[in-house]
């Protein structure tokens, strides 16, 4: 398969299911301001924190654990700390 075809295939498949290793999930609410909040209150969803990508956007990222900057912490019980020159990161006990 030519390189261009492989790249295009990856670009088509990648956005379909965007989950990171720490339990982050991209969700789409509705166009109203509290769409993500209403989405999370339905069913058995147990998401701790959400962040809308851009103001007025209906897309956002939600974490099953604590959100630190733009990433999800690896497990619950972590705190978000600032590391000089490296930015925000998760500090987890034990």
UniProtKB/Swiss-Prot annotation:
User: How would you summarize where this protein is expressed among tissues?
Assistant: Expressed by the venom duct.
Disulphide bridges, residue numbers: 63-72, 68-80, 73-90, 78-92
Record-listed 4-carboxyglutamate modification sites? 49
Main location, first listed in the record: secreted
Q: Which domain of life is it from?
A: Eukaryota
Q: Where in the cell?
A: Secreted
What positions belong to the pro-peptide in this record? 25-45
- Residue numbers carrying 4-hydroxyproline: 55
Region forming the signal peptide: 1-24
Query: Main role?
Result: Alpha-D-conopeptides act on postsynaptic membranes, they bind to the nicotinic acetylcholine receptors (nAChR) and thus inhibit them. Through its two C-terminal domains, this homodimeric protein would bind to two nAChR allosteric sites, located outside the nAChR C-loop of the principal binding face and at the adjacent binding interface in a clockwise direction. This toxin specifically blocks mammalian neuronal nAChR of the alpha-7/CHRNA7 (IC(50)=0.12 nM), alpha-3-beta-2/CHRNA3-CHRNB2 (IC(50)=1.08 nM), and alpha-4-beta-2/CHRNA4-CHRNB2 (IC(50)=4.5 nM) subtypes.
Q: Give the domain section of the comments.
A: The cysteine framework is XX (C-CC-C-CC-C-C-C-C). Displays a mini-granulin fold, a structure composed of two short, stacked beta-hairpins connected by two parallel disulfide bonds. This newly described fold is derived from the same cysteine connectivity as knottins (ICK fold). The name 'mini-granulin fold' comes from the structural homology with the N-terminal region of the human granulin.
What is this protein called in UniProt?
Alpha-conotoxin Ms20.3
Lineage of producing organism: Eukaryota, Metazoa, Spiralia, Lophotrochozoa, Mollusca
């Amino acid at each position: 398969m030519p390189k261009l075809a492989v790249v295009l295939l990856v670009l088509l498949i990648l956005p379909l299911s965007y989950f990171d290793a720490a339990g982050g999930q991209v969700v789409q609410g509705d166009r109203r301001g509290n769409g993500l909040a209403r989405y999370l209150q339905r069913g058995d969803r147990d998401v701790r924190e959400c962040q809308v990508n851009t103001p007025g956007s209906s897309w956002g990222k939600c974490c099953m654990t604590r959100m630190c900057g733009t990433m999800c912490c690896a497990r619950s019980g972590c705190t978000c700390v600032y590391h000089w020159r490296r930015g925000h990161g998760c500090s987890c006990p034990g």
